């Protein structure tokens, strides 16, 4: 209703101003600004909803602002461009409509009415309400009920007898198992669900609605609320360090805890969370690539579910044979939005809905088949009698191609349990939430029936039953939950460990690189990973007086304040204010001690603007002074005009990438010498090794032969035509996820370049 009201008020404001208000610059600007805010809010809501399926929520703050955890990046480029174009078009149309009758005399009454209606449209919009609620949740002091309901369990299980297999199905919510709504979509796993304890009303709460948040909620009994924005959990060295979670209890009780997934463990800080809470054996994309049968069989996120669950079965079998007590957690990925992925071994590769194939439903049908096969192997084994199997969704499905059909149903998370020691078939309709999962499992294993805010659904009462407004209650507890991090509020002295690539201050440790925004009562960490904006772009958003400490590779800050370090890949520390003074210090010791020193200087807005503009220069436009092209730093030598076909810098250099251009092209500002040596330090990828690689300058072509290891080759060129472009054409670019960023489409690699140098031998 509020959505319709806000649209009606918006249209009324536009019509009244366009036809009755007349000409007045101030009223026009004010009305256009408010109407434009309405448009921006709703486009933000649409964009957020596209990722989360739940509008503007904590998942947006935690993930989308910096990390794009919601999707393979390539699949969102077109929607992003579409949103930007729509924004420009709507603003242009608004301005044109509002000025349609600009030659008519101004009428204050109608102008005021139009402005009030515009303000009303903003206030009534769901986007404004959601943002307001998020802001309120950030500013609350806490809720007195938190101390009443937050309970810390005993650290051990008195007499543990059962092993645990816990399967997180990516976005695999219980709604998919409604056979009336989606006939024969989940027959294999649905049949298993009906054999066990099936909890049919597991609701989703704020702070539990994306993968790492769902894992934290299900193991620690609390939502994932943090004292920082973005994906900073990937940079911290510990995760809710004061909490006792399910993994801690299992480890203290003699369990060996294992976690297996197909994606990179660093993604969203899963490795930090698991290591902080009892898991000593972690297997992700990097760990599995040396043991799986086919390392090239991957999707955009990592290994397919059939591969991951095969490895999980091998772990289960080996651990069971060893006789040691263990837990085995695994996380699937094939059902990740927006489309999902189809494993090649499943029989169910296609599911039609409304008379046409639907990729998301197809991925669900395939993945559930793989999960069911894994479970049936366990059930058929002699070790099932000593095992508890848990199957749950990590969160409700986000905006995938099945989402509009899911939204027509009563949506709940999946959570069911199969007990090998005590088979029990029952559907339990008790109201519960994801925070209750860990407590329910702990209860079955013989421990307490509570963890944090979670309660066992077999012997306790969930917060979802206690509070009718449980979502609002959880948001009110957000400050209390944030305090559990015990996060430092100041930084005076700090230590950088050059070997471990970490910084320590006030008892906390973070991975490098890192940007800190420092105020009187708060230190906000802003990390950089493959999934977030580069730190210099994040720093460019700081206000002129914001104090910062920036620890990064020297060359990244050299173009601003330390040109002598333009080619250094060592660590440097910069601190100051963008509108004031900045310092840069080279980290030249293994254990480097530093202190913060923020001077209260006069702010220079011209300096601020210059710093921001320089920080925002894209990598390929950066130029440095050097007599060669150094590929492990961003940019190119000053002599280079432009280049293409080259991927991002890595620690050793850069790959050619045929996705960015069929050939490597380096265009220099001036003609290359009449006679020169081209010294190339490089290596080849895949089938490009030990094959002739054409290298052209003007009309002259030579060949380069490289192996898989880095070597240096010198080619002798004549350049009578004064050509200024160097072209290298790898003969067989290979599509691969080697060294790729999680969620990005595969690159097509040819050669890996470390350095290219032009040596003038003319005369």
UniProtKB/Swiss-Prot annotation:
Transmembrane stretches, start-end: 1-21, 26-46, 77-97, 108-128
What species was this sequence derived from?
Salmonella newport (strain SL254)
The family this protein is said to belong to: Belongs to the OpgB family.
Physiological role: Transfers a phosphoglycerol residue from phosphatidylglycerol to the membrane-bound nascent glucan backbones.
Give the bilayer topology: Multi-pass membrane protein
From the UniProt record, list the reaction(s) this protein catalyses: a phosphatidylglycerol + a membrane-derived-oligosaccharide D-glucose = a 1,2-diacyl-sn-glycerol + a membrane-derived-oligosaccharide 6-(glycerophospho)-D-glucose
Database matches in CDD domains: LTA_synthase
The lineage's top-level taxon is: Bacteria
A GO BP annotation? glucan biosynthetic process
Q: Does the keyword Nucleus apply?
A: no
Q: Which EC numbers does the record give?
A: 2.7.8.20
User: What PANTHER family does the entry give?
Assistant: LIPOTEICHOIC ACID SYNTHASE, PHOSPHOGLYCEROL TRANSFERASE I
Q: Where in the cell is it found?
A: Cell inner membrane
The answer on whether this UniProt entry bears the keyword Membrane reads yes
Q: What is this protein called?
A: Phosphoglycerol transferase I
Keywords for the protein's UniProt record, in alphabetical order: Cell inner membrane, Cell membrane, Membrane, Transferase, Transmembrane, Transmembrane helix
């Amino acid at each position: 209703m509020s959505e319709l009201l806000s649209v009606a008020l918006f249209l009324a404001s536009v019509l009244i101003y366009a036809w009755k208000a007349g000409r007045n610059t101030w009223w026009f600007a004010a009305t256009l600004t408010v109407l434009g805010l309405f448009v921006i809010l709703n486009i933000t809501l649409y964009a957020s909803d596209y990722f989360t399926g739940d509008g503007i929520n904590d998942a947006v703050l935690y993930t989308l602002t910096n990390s794009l955890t919601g999707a393979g990046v390539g699949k969102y480029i077109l929607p992003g461009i579409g949103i930007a174009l729509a924004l420009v078009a709507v603003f242009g149309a608004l301005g044109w409509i509002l000025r349609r009758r600009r030659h008519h005399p101004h009428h204050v009454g109608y102008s005021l009415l139009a402005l009030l209606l515009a303000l009303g449209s903003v206030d009534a919009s769901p986007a404004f309400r959601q943002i307001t609620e998020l802001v309120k949740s950030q500013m609350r002091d806490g809720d007195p009920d938190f101390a009443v309901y937050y309970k810390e369990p005993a650290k051990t299980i008195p007499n543990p007898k059962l092993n645990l297999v816990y399967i997180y199905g990516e976005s695999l919510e219980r709604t998919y198992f409604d056979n009336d709504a989606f006939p024969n979509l989940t027959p294999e796993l649905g049949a298993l669900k009906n054999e066990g304890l099936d909890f049919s009303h597991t609701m989703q709460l704020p702070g539990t609605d994306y993968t790492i948040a769902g894992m934290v909620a299900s193991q620690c009994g609390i939502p994932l609320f943090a004292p920082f924005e973005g994906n900073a959990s990937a940079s911290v060295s510990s995760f809710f360090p004061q909490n006792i979670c399910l993994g801690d209890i299992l480890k203290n009780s003699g369990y060996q805890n294992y976690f297996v997934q197909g994606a990179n463990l660093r993604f969203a800080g899963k490795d930090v969370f698991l290591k902080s809470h009892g898991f000593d054996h972690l297997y992700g994309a990097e760990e599995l690539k040396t043991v799986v049968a086919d390392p090239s069989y991957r999707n955009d996120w990592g290994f397919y579910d059939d591969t991951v669950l095969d490895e999980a079965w091998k772990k289960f079998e080996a651990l069971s044979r060893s006789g040691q007590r263990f837990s085995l957690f695994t996380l699937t990925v094939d059902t990740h939005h927006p489309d999902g992925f189809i494993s090649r071994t499943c029989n169910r590769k296609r599911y039609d809905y409304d008379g046409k194939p639907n990729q998301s439903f197809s991925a669900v049908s395939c993945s559930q088949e793989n999960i069911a096969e894994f479970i049936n192997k366990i059930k058929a084994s002699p070790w099932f009698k000593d095992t508890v199997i848990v199957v749950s969704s990590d969160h409700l499905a986000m905006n995938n191609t099945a989402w509009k059909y899911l939204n027509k149903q009563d949506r709940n998370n999946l959570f069911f349990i199969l007990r090998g020691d005590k088979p029990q078939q029952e559907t339990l309709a008790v109201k519960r939430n994801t925070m209750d999962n860990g407590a329910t499992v702990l209860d079955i294993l013989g421990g307490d029936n509570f963890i944090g805010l979670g309660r066992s659904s077999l012997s306790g009462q969930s917060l979802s039953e206690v509070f009718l407004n449980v979502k609002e209650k959880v948001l009110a507890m957000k400050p209390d939950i944030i305090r559990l991090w015990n996060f430092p509020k100041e930084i005076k002295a700090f230590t950088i460990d050059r070997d471990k690539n970490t910084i320590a201050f006030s008892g906390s440790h973070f991975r490098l690189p890192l940007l800190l925004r420092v105020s009187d009562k708060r230190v906000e960490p802003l990390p950089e990973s493959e999934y977030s904006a580069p730190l210099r772009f994040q720093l460019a958003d700081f206000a002129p007086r914001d104090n910062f400490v920036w620890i990064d590779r020297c060359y990244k800050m050299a173009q601003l304040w330390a040109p002598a370090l333009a080619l250094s890949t060592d660590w440097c520390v910069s601190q100051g204010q963008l509108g004031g003074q900045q310092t840069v210090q080279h980290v030249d010791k293994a254990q480097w001690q530093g202190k913060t020193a923020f001077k209260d200087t006069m702010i220079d807005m011209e300096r601020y603007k210059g710093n921001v503009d320089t920080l925002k220069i894209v990598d390929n436009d950066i130029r440095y002074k050097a007599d060669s092209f150094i590929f492990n730093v961003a940019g190119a030598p000053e002599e280079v005009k432009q280049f293409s076909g080259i991927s991002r810098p890595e620690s050793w250099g850069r790959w050619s990438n045929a996705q960015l251009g069929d050939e490597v092209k380096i265009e220099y500002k001036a003609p290359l010498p009449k006679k020169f040596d081209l010294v190339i330090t490089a290596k080849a990828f895949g089938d490009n090794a030990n094959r002739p690689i054409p290298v052209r300058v003007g009309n002259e072509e030579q060949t380069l032969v490289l192996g898989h290891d880095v070597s240096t080759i010198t080619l002798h060129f004549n350049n009578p035509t004064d050509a200024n472009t160097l072209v290298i054409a790898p003969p067989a670019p290979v599509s691969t996820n080697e060294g790729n960023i999680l969620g990005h489409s595969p690159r097509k690699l040819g050669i890996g370049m470390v350095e290219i140098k032009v040596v003038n031998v003319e005369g």
